[in-house]
Structure formats: C-alpha cells, structure tokens
Amino acid sequence: MLVLIKHPLIEIKLTEMRAAETSHKVFRSNLDEIASLMVYEVMRNYQTKPKKVITPIGVETIGKSFDREVVIIPILRAGLGMMQGILAMVPEARVGHIGIYRDEKTFQPIDYFFKIPDVPKDSYIMVVDPMLATGVSANDAINKLVNLGFSNIKLICLVGVQKGIDLIQKNHPNVDIYLASQDEKLNENNYIIPGLGDAGDRIFGTKAK
C-alpha cells in the first residue's frame, strides 16, 4: 500500500527543502521535523497493550504501551537525517543501521554495513530513507530483513517516484510505503525530478550546491 501523507506543515517544510539556496542547517532541521510529523501517521495502526502506572498523587491508572518492539532502521547515510525526528516521538525505539551506497556508473547498490538489534521477528520495523528513486537500495535493505524473518516492515521516505514505488510493491507487496510527496520522474542520472538534490550531501553539507 502506498500512503501519501499530506499536511500543510509538511508541504511548507518540503518546499523550503527543495530550494537550492536552503542551507544544510535548515534542510536538516526540516527533514527532522517532517520525519516526526510523518511517523504519527505511520504508527497509527500499531497495536498497544495495557500499562499500569502510579501518578504523582499515588493513584494507579491503566494506560498503554506498544505491544512489541519498535525498530528504526535508517539506510546510511541519508536515512540518518530522519532518525532523530522519529526517536523524538518514539524514544524507546531500538535503532539498526544498513549501509548501502549506489555505484555511480552502474547505479547498483553496494552493501557495506548491516547491524540491527536482537529483537523478535514480529517487531515493528521502520526502514527510513529520504529518497525513493530507483528503489534498488530500499529493496535491497528490505530483502535483508525479510531473509532474517521480519515481516512487519514499513518504508518511510520523504519523496519518491513511480519507478521506485513499483519495484517495492512488486517484490514486497506487504510492505507499506509512506511518502510526503510523489514526484514526477527520474533524470538520466537517476536523480528525482523535481526532487531536492542529493539528500545526503544536503544533510551533512558535504558538497556545494
């Protein structure tokens, strides 16, 4: 299932991120805030269980907690830009990391790091990456998780295009995809159009715009 999360705050912050003159400081801050706004919708159907607490005046009451582990898995490196925004909403979440970069000539994924928490296979897994372009990196990351036995996986991206969406939906029809914007297309270098440039470079300020 594809879910487009529409909200004026998200749309305004995304517009600022698209602008070439936006500093990496503002870009990073906006991405962090959009991730917080998106995860509210992503977690809407997560199940809870009763949790007993004692209030400051000594009264016992029953509230709620998630019924299983929540795990955030950013695809390095750009996915790190969404991690803190989600952790702000779910501070108890575990964090894993999957390192994948795209070969600039073949556009194929190159794996270089994989480490995730030791959690039950029915845990709530959120794979995060700002860009869903060809979908190859996200597909590779999801493949690794599925091969380990995880099934409750959601993919959260800021912007994406149909090509990447189609690849994930074809290979992983049970993985829900959440986007803030579905953009028009990819250019000859597989950059999203209109997009927002290279998300990793703009998050970390590693290349002049």
Curated annotation (Swiss-Prot):
Gene3D superfamilies assigned to the protein according to its UniProt record, in alphabetical order: 3.40.50.2020
Pathway: Pyrimidine metabolism; UMP biosynthesis via salvage pathway; UMP from uracil: step 1/1
Superkingdom of source: Bacteria
Reaction equation(s) it catalyzes: UMP + diphosphate = 5-phospho-alpha-D-ribose 1-diphosphate + uracil
Note on cofactor: Binds 1 Mg(2+) ion per subunit. The magnesium is bound as Mg-PRPP.
InterPro entries with a match to the protein in the record: PRibTrfase_dom (IPR000836), PRTase-like (IPR029057), Upp_B (IPR034332), UPRTase/APRTase (IPR050054), Ura_phspho_trans (IPR005765)
The protein's name: Uracil phosphoribosyltransferase
GO biological process, alphabetically ordered: UMP salvage; uracil salvage
Keywords: Allosteric enzyme, Glycosyltransferase, GTP-binding, Magnesium, Nucleotide-binding, Transferase
Enzyme kind, highest EC tier: transferase
Pfam families: UPRTase
Regulation acting on activity, per entry: Allosterically activated by GTP.
SUPFAM superfamilies attached to this UniProt entry: PRTase-like
Disulphide connectivity of cysteines: none
Annotated residues for binding of uracil: 192, 197-199
Molecular function terms, GO-annotated: GTP binding; magnesium ion binding; uracil phosphoribosyltransferase activity
Family designation: Belongs to the UPRTase family.
EC number: 2.4.2.9
Binding site for 5-phospho-alpha-D-ribose 1-diphosphate: 77, 102, 129-137, 198
Purpose of the protein: Catalyzes the conversion of uracil and 5-phospho-alpha-D-ribose 1-diphosphate (PRPP) to UMP and diphosphate.
Cofactors (names): Mg(2+)
